[in-house]
Amino acid sequence: MDRYVLRGGERGADRLGLLADADGGATSAFWDRAGLAGGAHCLDLGCGPGAVTVALARRVGPAGTVLAVDRDDVAIELAKRRMAAAGISNVSYAVADAYDFVATDEFDFAYSRLLLHHLSRPAEVLQRMWEAVRPGGVIAVDDVDFDGAFCHPPDDGFSFWRDRYAQVVRHHGGDPTLGRTLV
C-alpha cells in the first residue's frame, strides 16, 4: 500500500473512532442500500483499529463473520481489543497490505472505508475485492471527495486544512477526489 498520510496505530485510533461515530448513521444507510444482511460473510479491508468493524460485526450477527484486514499490526491489535471489549466474537483478523491481500470467492460482502483515496493504484485493490467476493456478492466502497468539503460560514483555517490534506494525499500518490469516481 502507499503511505497512509494520517496518524494510525494507537495515536490515530481516537480520531478514527470519532469519525466512525459521527458517520455511523450514514454508514448503516449505505449498508442498507448495498443489501448487507444478517448472516453475511464480510471482508473489512483497511479496517484500522476496528471502529467500523464493530458495527459491521453486529450488523451480520452471530451467524455472519467479518475478516478485518489492515497492514498496521498495531491497528489490528487495537481492533482485537475493541472486539473483546464489545463482546464480539465473529471477527477474525489478518495483517496484510491491501495490494497483497488474496482471497477467492470467500465473501458475500467486501467493504472498504476511507482507504482507496490514499492509494496510487486503487483499481488493483478493487480487483482484489472483486476476486474476494462470491458470485452475486457485493463490493461496497465508502470514500471521499475532498473537493466537496466545505465550511459555512467560510473559515480560512478549515480551507487551509482541506487544501493541505489534499496536497499531502496527492504527494503520496493518492487521489483526494476519488470518491466522485465511485458508482
Predicted feature residues:
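Class I SAM-dependent methyltransferase Rossmann-like catalytic core
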Residues: 3-23
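Conserved alpha-helix/loop element of class I SAM-dependent methyltransferases that forms part
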Residues: 21-41, 55
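Class I SAM-dependent methyltransferase SAM/SAH-binding core
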Residues: 43, 49-100
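Helix-to-beta-strand junctions that scaffold the AdoMet/dcAdoMet cofactor pocket
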Residues: 61, 119-120, 133-134
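A short acidic, Gly/Pro-enriched loop at the edge of an enzyme's catalytic core
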Residues: 100-109
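A short SAM/SAH-binding and catalytic strip from SAM-dependent methyltransferases
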Residues: 108-122
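A short glycine-rich, Lys/Arg-flanked "PGG" loop and its adjoining helix->strand segment in the class I
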Residues: 123-138
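Conserved catalytic/acceptor-binding region of the Class I
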Residues: 140-183
